[in-house]
């Protein structure tokens, strides 16, 4: 499973890179706004340090606008993936951009049929939003399982990005359900490292080490 980080915060991205576990980045207008910096400055900084896929979102709602913005974003780097919303106009844009060799990530997926439509339109990625479904008392992980089954049944190469991740259990369940990628907020990514027994074990090792005579370091 690949780990993307869902952020536009450069410091968070750098830390994830240093941990050696980062495969890519996803952003959106909300995350970009949280930085308080000009959008293009944020994007250029991200692309300067990330080798893997970086999803950048269009903001137009019509096909022409999405295609225009998608082409602009794609020119910023070879690893740019254009995020397109799951709409009829969006699927037209996906078809055009993918035909031009520009990879797309269809976002705001909430049903298996939406994912199937995106795959048929040629999307490189689909992003089912797990947490938002959980928020309305629907099991979001069932969506990932259904998409995985459908894609496997028909040989679609579109990759599944489990999105709207809220806690470590979401990551675990997405991995078990067969998601290709989980895009994870920084706080959840940090939480994946932690376990109380690990902390207890480290503390015991250090205390025992203090008893060792003539330590080399």
UniProtKB/Swiss-Prot annotation:
Gene3D superfamilies, per the entry: Aldolase class I
One Pfam family hit: TAL_FSA
Domain of life: Bacteria
Enzyme class: transferase
Main location, first listed in the record: cytoplasm
Keywords associated with the record: Cytoplasm, Pentose shunt, Schiff base, Transferase
UniProt-annotated catalytic positions: 83 (schiff-base intermediate with substrate)
GO MF entry, a single one: aldehyde-lyase activity
GO biological processes: carbohydrate metabolic process; pentose-phosphate shunt
E.C. numbers: 2.2.1.2
Subcellular location: Cytoplasm
GO cellular component terms listed in the entry, alphabetical order: cytoplasm
Keyword Transferase assigned: yes
Database matches in InterPro entries: Aldolase_TIM, TAL/FSA, Transaldolase_3B, Transaldolase_3B/F6P_aldolase, TSA/FSA_arc/bac
Protein's pathway: Carbohydrate degradation; pentose phosphate pathway; D-glyceraldehyde 3-phosphate and beta-D-fructose 6-phosphate from D-ribose 5-phosphate and D-xylulose 5-phosphate (non-oxidative stage): step 2/3
Catalytic activity: D-sedoheptulose 7-phosphate + D-glyceraldehyde 3-phosphate = D-erythrose 4-phosphate + beta-D-fructose 6-phosphate
Family annotation (HAMAP family): Transaldolase_3b
Stated family: Belongs to the transaldolase family. Type 3B subfamily.
Function, as annotated: Transaldolase is important for the balance of metabolites in the pentose-phosphate pathway.
Protein name: Probable transaldolase
Organism expressing this protein natively: Hydrogenobaculum sp. (strain Y04AAS1)
């Amino acid at each position: 499973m690949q780990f993307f980080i869902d952020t536009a915060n450069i410091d968070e991205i750098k830390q994830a890179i240093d941990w050696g576990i980062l495969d890519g980045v996803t952003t959106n207008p909300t995350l970009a706004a949280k930085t308080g910096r000009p959008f293009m400055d944020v994007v250029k900084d991200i692309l300067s340090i990330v080798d893997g896929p970086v999803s950048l979102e269009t903001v137009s709602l019509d096909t022409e606008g999405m295609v225009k913005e998608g082409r602009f974003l794609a020119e910023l780097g070879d690893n740019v993936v254009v995020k397109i919303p799951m709409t009829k106009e969006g699927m037209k844009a996906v078809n055009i951009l993918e035909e031009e060799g520009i990879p797309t990530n269809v976002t705001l997926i909430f049903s298996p049929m939406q994912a199937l439509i995106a795959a048929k339109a040629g999307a490189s990625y689909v992003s089912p939003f797990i947490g938002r479904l959980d928020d309305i008392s629907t099991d979001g992980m069932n969506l990932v399982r259904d998409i995985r089954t459908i894609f496997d049944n028909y040989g679609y190469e579109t990759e599944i990005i489990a999105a709207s991740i809220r806690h470590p259990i979401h990551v675990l369940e997405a991995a078990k359900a067969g998601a290709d990628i989980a895009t994870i907020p920084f706080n959840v990514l940090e939480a994946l490292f932690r376990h109380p027994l690990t902390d207890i074990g480290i503390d015991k090792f250090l205390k025992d080490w203090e008893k060792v005579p003539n330590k080399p370091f």
